[in-house]
Amino acid sequence: MNVIQTIDAEQIGKLAEARAVPDFKPGDNLRVSVRVTEGERTRIQAFEGVCIARSNRGINSNFTVRKISYGEGVERVFPLYSPNVTEIAVTRRGVVRRAKLYYLRGRRGKSARIAEAARETNAD
């Protein structure tokens, strides 16, 4: 590994200790809690929607979440290892066959739904 990759690995290790990053894929419903500063006040804001893309680039990894708010589509890109992202929770697992779900942008209503993954059971 070169120097930059070593530094990236160290930083990812430090950030992973502070906050657990769940295993999620495009198609999953996520609730992302973000620290928002307005003036001198700081609060936690939740953004819940479908993960439509994930880019794995080491410390620069990010993911895109899409939701429909008051009839308008809203997308937000979150850096995976940002200190402003306080929590990422998977609320529902989806089954898709694509890595990027940009086709959901052109769909409305029932055609924009994603099938839910079957629950995994540990049968002994």
Curated annotation (Swiss-Prot):
Family per record: Belongs to the bacterial ribosomal protein bL19 family.
GO biological process: translation
Upper lineage: Bacteria, Pseudomonadati, Pseudomonadota, Alphaproteobacteria, Acetobacterales
Name the record gives this protein: Large ribosomal subunit protein bL19
Keywords: Ribonucleoprotein, Ribosomal protein
Role according to the record: This protein is located at the 30S-50S ribosomal subunit interface and may play a role in the structure and function of the aminoacyl-tRNA binding site.
GO molecular function, one term: structural constituent of ribosome
HAMAP family: Ribosomal_bL19 (MF_00402)
GO CC annotations on file: cytosolic large ribosomal subunit
